[in-house]
């Protein structure tokens, strides 16, 4: 399941809340951080970072970039890095676990002028295409802001796309565009309205494409805002409606 949206819409917050709910329901969850700029997702999840990112484990950005260049020169369609794998087979070098909740970072921008994030997109795409999960297992993918991951093909290996829509024109335009792209790729799609109050709910709904399935509505929460400001885990924050959202996805 891929979660996207504009910057500040609450993607990482929703990923964390859904992951916690799934964990408490007895599922095994891996959260994949595909945002090369996000630095604090593990904190709100309540999971320690692993020793290295997946990109580092594969030899670093230079190694992956070299493979991509080789693919272009040979006119191959895509990079092949991974064989078929399960959650249990993933190395503890790049995945950290808190009971049945795991956390994996694809890669991060570490230096000035190090270049684009395309190699990270290629790694994420191939990883998601080769990971196989059981019925009680979930993978939640937290993406960077916008829709660049659509262009990189990251959505290729996911079953469901969720766009987080906060009260802004940018969020509405992005949701409608993402819905169009997801439909072109025959992907299940839904939206979660976030930071909502009664005065704007109907306005927001009226501006979204009428074919978009609204999975749920989450009110603005000062508890979430304070937890995020302090860098605390959202483990103790209660939000109504998460079970209903998961039922819509199932």
Where are these regions (language model features)?
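Walker A (P-loop) phosphate-binding loop of P-loop NTPases
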Residues: 7-8
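Conserved catalytic-core segment of NTP-binding enzymes
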Residues: 17, 119-217, 225-226
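Residues in the short beta-alpha loop(s) of Rossmann-like NAD(P)-binding domains
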Residues: 35-37, 195-197, 221
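Cytosolic-facing regulatory segments adjacent to core modules
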Residues: 79-94, 102-139
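C-terminal boundary of histidine-terminating zinc-finger modules
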Residues: 228-239
